[in-house]
Amino acid sequence: MSEVRRPSSSQPAADGAIRHDWTREEAEALYALPFPDLMFRAQSVHRRHFDPTRLETASLLSIKTGGCPEDCGYCSQSAHYDTGLKATKLMDRDTVVATAQRAKAAGAERFCMAAAWRSPKDRDLDQVCDMVSAVKDLGMETCVTLGMLTPPQAQRLKQAGLDFYNHNVDTSPEFYDRIITTRTLQDRIDTLAHVRDAGIKVCCGGIIGMGEAVDDRLGMMVLLANLGAHPDSVPINMWNEVKGVPVNDTAARPDPIALVRLIAVTRIMMPQSVVRLSAGRQYMSDELQSLCLLAGANSIFIGDVLLTTANPQADRDAALLARLGMTSALSVRPAAATAPSETADSSLVA
């Protein structure tokens, strides 16, 4: 099975050396380029580092849902808000492994496990490590997102065979305090450092559509690009409306072309990172998703649910890849024939 090619850090970047000194002004200048010029530049960078016809596919499972003590204003799993979500205990290992087996059969190459914690307790971490080892035995890449980690906890996950750790910065430094008050941005950056020091690959991105300005979206990418090492994966999530959370009061639907521009800028600034088109795809037309892939996105989540929100059905994804002439583990599955999308407005959830 072919894989998304992950270049080594020694390879030169298409627009020059890998940089960690990007400015807001440079990001804004890229974003403001005429659309054809921006897309050409992003696609040129993409082709120097990745196979542009190859898409990475991952599956996401909530192994512990709800009851989180953090007050993230977008999250259905926060105990601070009445979202109607029932908290659950940590899922047992056998159930997780069975779900991973189904995900692999459906075309997923990576299996991501998420727990709604501020930070894991050591006894819970031991169980998660067992899950990681068992999923690795299936021949899948593994990723977890468990909240903040200490250096010893990161080392323990590495010993269990963990490939990726997801810990998003969520938004720009300027907008951050309007979304979260129980965990600082520096807390997040510290955890990213612990993960990287342990030898685990970093998955780190954020959310758009919470009421932030375009400058905030670019500021988030500048923050990520100026870390000591670029994230190995950069997930870009679109805000999905959630009952009872305060972000509902500020959320604004992103313009579809603005999303494509952001992905293109991300690809140029972090040329060797896998850019994942994450939450919100169920509200995107096939045409908009195709533009996102052309701009440099090269990974998606598959499966009908992402944690607590909907996701496109796998058959729709497989049919789109077939129409585009692109490949992934998903594309080897028989795809149900579907008519071309007739969605005209490419609307996104805010």
UniProtKB/Swiss-Prot annotation:
<feature type="binding site">
    <location>
        <position position="72"/>
    </location>
    <ligand>
        <name>[4Fe-4S] cluster</name>
    </ligand>
</feature>
<dbReference type="InterPro" id="IPR024177">
    <property type="entry name" value="Biotin_synthase"/>
</dbReference>
<comment type="function">
    <text>Catalyzes the conversion of dethiobiotin (DTB) to biotin by the insertion of a sulfur atom into dethiobiotin via a radical-based mechanism.</text>
</comment>
<keyword id="KW-0408">Iron</keyword>
<feature type="binding site">
    <location>
        <position position="68"/>
    </location>
    <ligand>
        <name>[4Fe-4S] cluster</name>
    </ligand>
</feature>
<dbReference type="InterPro" id="IPR006638">
    <property type="entry name" value="Elp3/MiaA/NifB-like_rSAM"/>
</dbReference>
<keyword id="KW-0004">4Fe-4S</keyword>
<dbReference type="GO" id="GO:0051537">
    <property type="term" value="F:2 iron, 2 sulfur cluster binding"/>
</dbReference>
<dbReference type="Pfam" id="PF04055">
    <property type="entry name" value="Radical_SAM"/>
</dbReference>
<keyword id="KW-0808">Transferase</keyword>
<keyword id="KW-0479">Metal-binding</keyword>
<keyword id="KW-0093">Biotin biosynthesis</keyword>
<dbReference type="InterPro" id="IPR007197">
    <property type="entry name" value="rSAM"/>
</dbReference>
<feature type="binding site">
    <location>
        <position position="112"/>
    </location>
    <ligand>
        <name>[2Fe-2S] cluster</name>
    </ligand>
</feature>
<feature type="binding site">
    <location>
        <position position="75"/>
    </location>
    <ligand>
        <name>[4Fe-4S] cluster</name>
    </ligand>
</feature>
<keyword id="KW-0949">S-adenosyl-L-methionine</keyword>
<feature type="binding site">
    <location>
        <position position="143"/>
    </location>
    <ligand>
        <name>[2Fe-2S] cluster</name>
    </ligand>
</feature>
<comment type="subunit">
    <text>Homodimer.</text>
</comment>
<keyword id="KW-0411">Iron-sulfur</keyword>
<dbReference type="InterPro" id="IPR013785">
    <property type="entry name" value="Aldolase_TIM"/>
</dbReference>
<dbReference type="GO" id="GO:0009102">
    <property type="term" value="P:biotin biosynthetic process"/>
</dbReference>
<keyword id="KW-0001">2Fe-2S</keyword>
<feature type="binding site">
    <location>
        <position position="276"/>
    </location>
    <ligand>
        <name>[2Fe-2S] cluster</name>
    </ligand>
</feature>
<dbReference type="Pfam" id="PF06968">
    <property type="entry name" value="BATS"/>
</dbReference>
<feature type="binding site">
    <location>
        <position position="203"/>
    </location>
    <ligand>
        <name>[2Fe-2S] cluster</name>
    </ligand>
</feature>
<dbReference type="InterPro" id="IPR002684">
    <property type="entry name" value="Biotin_synth/BioAB"/>
</dbReference>
<comment type="similarity">
    <text>Belongs to the radical SAM superfamily. Biotin synthase family.</text>
</comment>
<comment type="pathway">
    <text>Cofactor biosynthesis; biotin biosynthesis; biotin from 7,8-diaminononanoate: step 2/2.</text>
</comment>
<dbReference type="GO" id="GO:0004076">
    <property type="term" value="F:biotin synthase activity"/>
</dbReference>
<dbReference type="GO" id="GO:0051539">
    <property type="term" value="F:4 iron, 4 sulfur cluster binding"/>
</dbReference>
<dbReference type="InterPro" id="IPR010722">
    <property type="entry name" value="BATS_dom"/>
</dbReference>
<feature type="domain" description="Radical SAM core">
    <location>
        <begin position="53"/>
        <end position="281"/>
    </location>
</feature>
<dbReference type="GO" id="GO:0005506">
    <property type="term" value="F:iron ion binding"/>
</dbReference>
<protein>
    <recommendedName>
        <fullName>Biotin synthase</fullName>
        <ecNumber>2.8.1.6</ecNumber>
    </recommendedName>
</protein>
